[in-house]
A protein has these predicted regions:
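Generic protein-terminus/edge-of-domain signal
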Residues: 1-66, 71, 87, 112-114
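Ligand-binding loop in jelly-roll beta-barrel domains
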Residues: 78-102
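Amphipathic alpha-helical segments enriched in hydrophobic/aromatic residues interleaved with Lys/Arg
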Residues: 105-132
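Conserved metal-binding segment of the jelly-roll/cupin
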Residues: 67-81
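A generic short alpha-helical patch detector that favors 3-5-residue windows
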Residues: 19, 95-98, 118-122
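Amphipathic, well-ordered alpha-helical segments in soluble domains
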Residues: 23-26, 47-50, 99-102, 122-128
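Secondary-structure boundary/capping motif
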Residues: 55-58, 73, 93, 126
Length: 132
């Protein structure tokens, strides 16, 4: 476990195996930081995040999605995206970055193209994953 320059606690670092059915590449917690901003072009993982508190935004293409406490979202691999914390009320979020054929098939089967956002409390699931 370590902290990076974005004030994120990295709790798991996996290995990239392009032939794997399912891989957890990275998992962690982003703590409140009004300057937090991530830009990903052709994102190389599937991103799953849960907003524990605060607010932020996600830009995909020409659309902006605002997220807040109690929201879950996932981003498809290969998209260009920007996500950032609110200046006034920066978020804390838990996240996991996944890859593999199984994740790709789930996105395809459930038509989860590009970005899926839902107001659903999945914090206990993220806590359980992070505790493993």
């Amino acid at each position: 476990m370590y902290f990076n320059t974005y004030n994120e606690k990295i709790i798991y670092v996996g290995k990239n195996d392009p032939y794997s059915l399912f891989s957890c590449m990275l998992a962690g917690v982003t703590y409140k930081n009004p300057n937090y901003r991530i830009v990903r072009n052709n994102c190389d993982v599937y991103v799953f995040e849960y907003v524990v508190s605060g607010k932020g935004s996600i830009e995909v293409g020409d659309r902006v999605y605002d997220v807040h406490e109690g929201m879950f979202y996932c981003l498809e691999k290969g998209v260009d995206e920007v996500h950032y914390a609110s200046q006034d009320e920066p978020y804390e979020k838990m996240w996991i970055n996944l890859d593999g054929e199984l994740v790709r098939k789930i996105f395809s089967f459930f038509n989860l193209s590009t970005l899926y956002v839902a107001e659903v409390n999945v914090m206990n699931i993220f806590i359980e994953i992070h505790d493993k």
